[in-house]
Amino acid sequence: MAHPDGMARLLKFGVRNVPVVAKGDKFVFGQVIADVAELVGVKAPGQVGLTPDELVSRWLFVLEAAQRYVRQLPTGKLEERAVANRDRSIRYLGFHVFRIGEALLEVTEGEEMTVERPNVPPGDTVHTGDDIARYGEQVIVRIGQWWGQTADKACANRVPTYYGQQPLRDVLERCVWHSAQHVRQLMALLERWEIAPDRPVTDADLKGLPVPAGIWE
């Protein structure tokens, strides 16, 4: 968090996770733009976005790119922090890209999207980039199977999340851009070490996804 008093304000509300928008003594989670608009007193913007089918296709593309990049990560760097001000290893970051996908699959099976669900750390058997990529392959296959079998192609069903009941389509979109943002970070790490990412993901590839402007936001 960039604001020096930001965490203190969150703790005052009993909140430990971002994004959060606060106004006076009220706050809402920032995942739902309509809730934010209501809090600040403006009209919510109309949102169309990608269709669920486009989101799944974009997600698989992003996850396959992540497989390439984690294989390029130097093993000796995996326990280093991705950024100095956050206690998260590069190994964790690479695993997290795919764990987001597994979390969404669990939600489609009736589980709640809690804060903790996509943040499960890698197990003791995940040590190398190849280990992460193999885990990623399992997730990619399962996402493809789920999408091929689901009858709810509009993703209209509402699912429980830590920020309330939400349409599955919106939770899917959040998971897709969340993975995509971390893939951008993996590319940035490779470039930091002067390793050219294998077939870089471009801004054009991510068009239509609400990824943050900054790579480390």
Roles of regions detected by a PLM:
Residues 22-48:
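Non-catalytic, surface beta->alpha helical segment in thiol-disulfide oxidoreductase systems
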Residues 59-70, 124-159, 166-185:
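Acidic/histidine-rich alpha-helical segments that form the ligand environment
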Residues 50-74, 95-106:
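Alpha-helical bundle segments that constitute or directly flank the non-heme di-iron/ferroxidase center
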Residues 1-6, 16:
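Thiol-based oxidoreductase modules, predominantly thioredoxin-like and allied folds used
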Residues 11-22, 31:
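Structural micro-motif
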Residues 42-55, 124, 131:
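Short, charged, low-complexity loops and linkers
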Residues 77-122, 160-217:
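Short, contiguous alpha-helical
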